[in-house]
Amino acid sequence: MKEFKTLEESLEAARYILPESLYKELVETVEKEDGLSEEDKISVVKETIRTYLRSLAQPGEAVGTVAAQSIGEPGTQMTLRTFHYAGIMEFDVTLGLPRLIEIVDAKQTPSQPLMYIYLKDEYAKDLEKAKEAARKIEYTTLEKIIDNIEWDLGDRVVAIVINAEYMEDKGVTVDMVLEALDKSKLGKVVEDGVREVSEGGVKKVIVYFEISDKQLPDEELFNSNAYHKVLEKLKNTYIKGIKGIRKVTVRREEGEDSYEYMLIVEGSNLREVLMLPEVDHRRSISNDIQEIAQVLGIEAARTAIIEEIKRVLEDSGLDVDIRHLMLIADLMTWPGYVRQIGRLGVVGEKPSPLARAAFEVTVKQLYEAAVWGEEEEFAGVTENIIAGLPPRVGTGSVLLRMGAARK
């Protein structure tokens, strides 16, 4: 490597060689290190450039194959270790191989959608304000605050027994319940039909509700199945919250010299949650990659794929170079939407009929290729191996002609 006489000269060379983010970090590090001589700082810059150049893929390197191996091999260990659901806090979280498959298959919705919601400073430091934000987000129906619904065959009036503690926990008032019942169009609250009682020291509110004849015709008054259908609708009456958010838990996160409260959310509705004034939209994330692509764009989805795969591997105690994950994320997102790796995505869109046939549904792929008169260019690795030809990677990417002996 060229010898540099001054620090400025070495940094100028680094500016042309290193990525912008790495260059800025190098400059900041060198400038704030007062204990190093200029010669030492030049050595740091040279070593950074040398390390970066050594990290670059060589021309002809089969980076796709290496990336596949780098994730596939740890995947066999994940199968043995974590092919199950593990309880984290109060939620079931998909871990290990099942979650990895969800990510690379680009599932429309994950089996266990979760959101990690960070709050703005005025809410993040106050537990009560954080709880209030959680109550505002959680989708609350009548079923979540009642003990039971008492009813008798032949009587349209049912008694909805509401637990006052449940109401307080969910941030619901009696007026909110009455308004929700009025909007349900299942019937009406009878006049003076609200009573407060106490049973065994537990406060309860009983609401007497008359089911409309449209929901329960006279001929169905003695049909228990008809009653249960209406009562199920009654339990699902919406009171407040954001659709898709099933449960919210407040968690305290400790930093080096500070703390903050954040929300772990079971369910996902990124668009509406990010619009809330309490939410810090810069840090809040979801594990639903398709939703991220729709709400925040394809670049955000690419970052989410990298972070989700990285988290799955780390949870299993595995360490994979992030550049392999970046390559896979690029492959899944470069068309502008999130596509799966399999035959309905990356593999299925390959121009080579032999490469497509080698993955799945071989006969169908060959049949369709013949019908449409597709040509095999032998440009990829798979098709060349099938045909017994040297793949165009490594030394096979260079065409050589033997020189004839000169007379």
Curated annotation (Swiss-Prot):
One of its GO terms (molecular function) is DNA-directed RNA polymerase activity. It catalyses: RNA(n) + a ribonucleoside 5'-triphosphate = RNA(n+1) + diphosphate. It comes from the Archaea. SUPFAM superfamilies: beta and beta-prime subunits of DNA dependent RNA-polymerase. It is found in: Cytoplasm. Pfam families: RNA_pol_Rpb1_5 (PF04998). InterPro entries: DNA-dir_RpoC_beta_prime (IPR045867), RNA_pol_Rpb1_5 (IPR007081), RPO1C (IPR012757). Disulfide bonds: none annotated. GO terms for biological process: DNA-templated transcription. The keyword Cytoplasm applies. Its EC number is 2.7.7.6. Gene3D superfamilies: 1.10.150.390. Keywords: Cytoplasm, DNA-binding, DNA-directed RNA polymerase, Nucleotidyltransferase, Transcription, Transferase. It is an enzyme of class 2 (transferase). Transmembrane segments: none annotated. One of its GO terms (cellular component) is cytoplasm. Its main location: cytoplasm. Belongs to the RNA polymerase beta' chain family. PANTHER family: DNA-DIRECTED RNA POLYMERASE, DNA-DIRECTED RNA POLYMERASE III SUBUNIT RPC1. DNA-dependent RNA polymerase (RNAP) catalyzes the transcription of DNA into RNA using the four ribonucleoside triphosphates as substrates. Forms part of the jaw domain. Part of the RNA polymerase complex. This is DNA-directed RNA polymerase subunit Rpo1C. The gene is rpo1C.
